[in-house]
Amino acid sequence: MESTTLASLAAVSVLAAGAQTDMSDVLWLLILGFVIAFILAFSVGANDVANSFGTAVGSGVVTLRQACILATIFETVGAMLLGAKVSETIRSGIIDVHMYNGSEAVLMAGSISAMFGSAVWQLAASFLKLPISGTHCIVGATIGFSMVARGHQGVKWLELLRIVASWFLSPLLSGIMSAVLFYFVRKFILNKDDPVPNGLRALPVFYAVTMGINLFSIMFTGAPMLGFDRIPWWGTLLISLGCAILTALVVWFIVCPRLKKKMQSKCLGPNIADTSGTQLVEKKPSSNGLMDHHPGPPRNYSPVPQTPPADSNKVAFDIGGSAETDLDKKEFDTKDQDCTHALNGSGGIVIPDLSGNQFHTVHKDSGIYKDLLHKLHLAKVGECIGEPVEKPIRRNNSYTSYTMAIYGIHGSLKDGEGGSRTGLDGEKRRSRYDSYNSYCTAVADGEAALEDAALAVGMEDEALREDVLEEDIDELEIDKPEVSTLFQFLQILTACFGSFAHGGNDVSNAIGPLVALWLIYDSASVAPSAPTPIWLLLYGGVGICTGLWIWGRRVIQTMGKDLTPITPSSGFSIELASAITVVVASNIGLPVSTTHCKVGSVVSVGWLRSRKAVDWHLFRNIFIAWFVTVPISGLISAAIMALFYYVILPLT
């Protein structure tokens, strides 16, 4: 009996040694696969991860650095907890791996080809600032190498059709969910004269739904390392509901009173907050005497003559070696009054005649440009502006907004409203002052600016308000400061959950082929039954976060600013609806596109806010990129696989 056991152990040892010897010949493929997999994970981070926090950065609730830190945490955790299930679909759900029995090296070479083709196209798309689907890339690349190695028989076409259908359904469903959610937010909160009461009542519901949905998803996935695989579905449902109710109670009794107190303290005076990227100014604490209220009787803000004597309000700025004239209280009040009426379209403003017609370039960090103009305008807008703050002049950049505000130039005066002013003057009026010397150009064109402001005074108030914003975001709503306060942290929370969902869904795009490589090498089988190693998912998460930190800002700009303006309220609707769609898809093992869900939500909410708010030209380019992703990544993968199959592998 003992000799039989020893003989059996010896036979097993010989077979294992033979298998290990055979697989050692393809060790170089495994090493090459790890290198290319990290590059692929880098490209996924540079392109796909930007979708998670792009709207949060675009609305201004977090900075780019803060977004990268949060994404690093939640992408990695989501990859380890949710990524294993979707990796199974990517690894063995697209092609029939049993066709590669006895030719493991061919399947390993195919996995490398798929990762290479996907990485190249995603890096190219990131360079072009186009958000594309990482799932599209890896699926197309997998089909490409399989067509070279085994022809069309190696592809599961029905599975491919199911995935293709999900590509169209995911943006549609996510867009509908986001639009419906934002519709109710706008109807019951944003459109109210006082949005705070309804907003505070809705906060517990929003937090509870966000927490409950994501907790159910995490637990229903059944992560073995957390013991969730031993909890039945009804237990998962009860735990999720309990946590959601607890979250709602905490928000109602702790968070809401603090927010209400915070907003009441800020309501002592009007606030102008730059939370949407389209506001005119940015609220900053006052550190200069120019911002303080002046003692004395109330000021009279009645209209002033359109063309007061130039000598009465002349100011000399200290630029370089220029002379300086102190502003006493009377002169300061006069200038404040003129500036305010120029902003409201009810009065003119005098352009000082600089001696010698010598103009100085005022750079971005100049004290006169940064302190005097900014603080003077901020103080007057906060104290005595008569227009509602929902429709300020859009800030194309800092130079344009300050210059237009000081000189009373309205944002979108049409050519025909200037009467007989054509030619060179019309060109000056339409210029956007986008360079560093825009301030000097505005001074030189002061006379034309005065005429434009005078023309605007005669227009009706309603028509003037409709003409303030640029044509592309006409009638676009802007969140009030109190609404922004309500939705800021909520959008951060939904963005974090969206990043978590993305880590679970899209880490498979980078690690699925690498998992196949490792398991083939480790077990010498093309269809191993071993689960996905956690350390491989962590490896992919590190590569994804590296790509986000180094190159993620390009696609963040497209998603958060270029496609459509984002506010905290609309960003919350986008984040929550798209996160729910992606998390549910991850739990059923369907590799939907996170990019499609997010872009669908952004476009639908932007269109609901205003039909002209969406950059349809950019959306067309993104849509075209979606359709060419599968064939381009497939062709690149097929070319690399042909090189392996016909040249490299026969030589080894």
UniProtKB/Swiss-Prot annotation:
Entry's localization field: Membrane
Protein topology in the membrane: Multi-pass membrane protein
Organism superkingdom: Eukaryota
Predominant place of localization: membrane
Biased composition (Basic and acidic residues): 281-295
Residue intervals annotated with topology Extracellular: 47-66, 126-162, 223-234, 504-531, 593-621
Regions of this protein lying in the Cytoplasmic compartment: 1-25, 88-104, 184-201, 256-482, 553-571, 643-652
Parts of the chain that traverse the membrane: 26-46, 67-87, 105-125, 163-183, 202-222, 235-255, 483-503, 532-552, 572-592, 622-642
Region (Disordered): 278-308
A GO cellular-component term linked to this record: membrane
GO terms for biological process, alphabetical: cloaca development; phosphate ion transmembrane transport
Pro residues bias spans: 297-308
InterPro entries to which the protein is assigned, alphabetical: Phos_transporter (IPR001204)
Gene Ontology molecular-function annotations: phosphate transmembrane transporter activity; symporter activity
Alphabetized UniProt keyword annotations: Membrane, Phosphate transport, Symport, Transmembrane, Transmembrane helix, Transport
Function: Sodium-phosphate symporter which plays a fundamental housekeeping role in phosphate transport.
Family statement: Belongs to the inorganic phosphate transporter (PiT) (TC 2.A.20) family.
Name the UniProt record assigns to this protein: Sodium-dependent phosphate transporter 1-A
UniProt organism field: Danio rerio (Zebrafish)
Gene for this chain: slc20a1a
